[in-house]
Regions:
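A short acidic, helix-capping loop that chelates divalent metal ions and anchors anionic groups
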Residues: 88, 254-255
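Polar low-complexity intrinsically disordered regions
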Residues: 1, 281-282
């Protein structure tokens, strides 16, 4: 059985800085038995990550972090072991990526009035053919000397409450839960109490997601203070949700260390049992 798993990591195919192969190698060095690759709204990195399993000895749970929106509040869902060819899911991912890029162009236009940044600067940090979003804008701002790191750029310039922010289309989280469940996937609500980065989702919406088939909720996350973790634990008990811990690792530019939080192997075993595709084993 998998002993140490970090079920929330990102590669350069979305907003991380490591290739999927590098990501698995870093996981091996950190003593992890498995990771889940959860790039934003894409499965592009799955094949490369799968090819790295044998020589790294790290098992791979294939997933994605699905962007959603509820009354203007950004919601992130970790989706695991779903059919990547499911038409509804493919369409949601495509539409979200396209609208996010349109939004990014508008945000750069807003920012350029106060910061030395162009769209070409942002594209230099984005994966070729991959999604372009706020992390790549943050990297361009850091490169321009406007902020010391990604985290500072997010808090001071790219926060949803700030003057430069532009909303983009994303599916309703309850509908997204139903969509991923139809694709055979297992869903976990990511960092629901990350107060510095987002407005908080009302508990009533989380309850509706649980009723629609949400499996778990992320408790142990760097952006959750001790009191937030206790609050998530309470919600998990009341709503019958499994509790997860993860790093939300992105590589360089963010302090998150791979494996700094992990998830109980019995919880992961249930994810594997419910998923519709297999885990890639060494």
């Amino acid at each position: 059985m998998v002993k140490r798993i970090d079920p929330h990591t990102h590669s350069a195919y979305s907003d991380g800085t490591d290739t999927p192969a590098q990501l698995l190698a870093i996981a091996a060095q950190a003593g992890l038995d498995a990771i889940a690759l959860t790039d934003h709204d894409t499965t592009t990195g799955w094949d490369e990550a799968s090819a790295a399993v044998t020589h790294t000895g790290v098992s791979l749970i294939r997933g994605a972090e699905m962007s959603c929106s509820s009354s203007g509040i950004t919601v992130h869902l970790l989706a695991y072991l779903f059919d990547p060819a499911s038409p509804g899911l493919v369409d949601n991912f495509r539409r979200t990526r396209e609208d996010r890029e349109t939004r990014a162009v508008r945000m750069v236009e807003n920012l350029s009035a106060d910061y030395p940044i162009t769209w070409e600067d942002v594209l230099a940090f984005a994966p070729e053919g991959g999604p372009v979003g706020r992390p790549h804008i943050a990297d361009a701002l850091v490169a321009a000397g406007a902020f010391p790191d990604r985290s500072a750029a997010f808090v001071q310039a790219l926060h949803p409450s700030g003057p430069y922010y532009v909303h983009y289309w994303a599916p309703d989280p309850v509908e997204a839960v139903r969509c991923v469940r139809q694709a055979g996937g297992v869903l976990v609500l990511a960092h629901p109490r990350a107060r510095k980065r987002q407005r908080l989702l009302p508990e009533s919406v989380i309850a509706d997601m649980a009723a629609a088939g949400l499996f778990g909720i992320e408790r142990d996350h760097r952006d959750h203070a001790p009191e937030d973790r206790l609050d998530v634990e309470r919600m998990a008990r009341e709503m019958g949700l499994a509790m997860f811990g993860s790093s939300d690792y992105h590589g360089a530019g963010k302090p998150n260390r791979i494996g700094e939080n992990t998830t109980d192997p019995q919880v992961i075993a249930e994810v594997i049992a419910q998923g519709s595709i297999e885990v890639i084993e060494p």
